[in-house]
Amino acid sequence: MPRRREVPKRDVLPDPKFGSVELTKFMNALMVDGKKSVDERIVYGALEQTAKKVQGKEAIEVFNEAIDNAKPIVEVKSRRVGGANYQVPVEVRPSRRLALAMRWVRDAARKRGEKSMDLRLADELIDAAEGRGGAMKKREEVHRMAEANKAFSHFRF
């Protein structure tokens, strides 16, 4: 247990356009070198593209659906027992779930081949909302690892 005092969580303000705290957190995760204005332009541009491509749904709905679909339920953690390292499956805390989903969507969007980042992000959000794409692939991979190491789940933390 840490001996220092617990650091308080900082509240994140909702974004001005959609009023979503999750969207602000995603913007902060996407930000490079503290350039928030560039980041906002990318995210809002991506959401506009998403609204054009997906008919009958709001862009923020697609974003929320994409993040929810990408959230992992279980992951593996290394645990050393008697000189051997075991990959022990553990349930993911809700705050970490959100952070991992956002990170995976961001990384998958960066790896895509489209011309600009807002197009990449828009397509990745649409793919994740529909249950495919790089972020979903990463989630399935993590779940497969946990399933494969289910035998070591009695080595709980």
Curated annotation (Swiss-Prot):
Sorted UniProt keywords: Ribonucleoprotein, Ribosomal protein, RNA-binding, rRNA-binding, tRNA-binding
Q: Which GO terms describe its biological process?
A: translation
- Domain of life according to the entry: Bacteria
- Quote any Pfam family the record assigns: Ribosomal_S7
User: What cellular-component terms does GO give this entry?
Assistant: small ribosomal subunit
Q: Name one GO molecular function term.
A: rRNA binding
InterPro entries reported in the protein's UniProt record: Ribosomal_uS7 (IPR000235), Ribosomal_uS7_bac/org-type (IPR005717), Ribosomal_uS7_CS (IPR020606), Ribosomal_uS7_dom (IPR023798), Ribosomal_uS7_dom_sf (IPR036823)
Please give the function described in this protein's UniProt entry.
Answer: One of the primary rRNA binding proteins, it binds directly to 16S rRNA where it nucleates assembly of the head domain of the 30S subunit. Is located at the subunit interface close to the decoding center, probably blocks exit of the E-site tRNA.
Subunit annotation = Part of the 30S ribosomal subunit. Contacts proteins S9 and S11.
Q: Which family does it belong to?
A: Belongs to the universal ribosomal protein uS7 family.
Name by which UniProt lists this protein: Small ribosomal subunit protein uS7
The gene behind this protein is rpsG
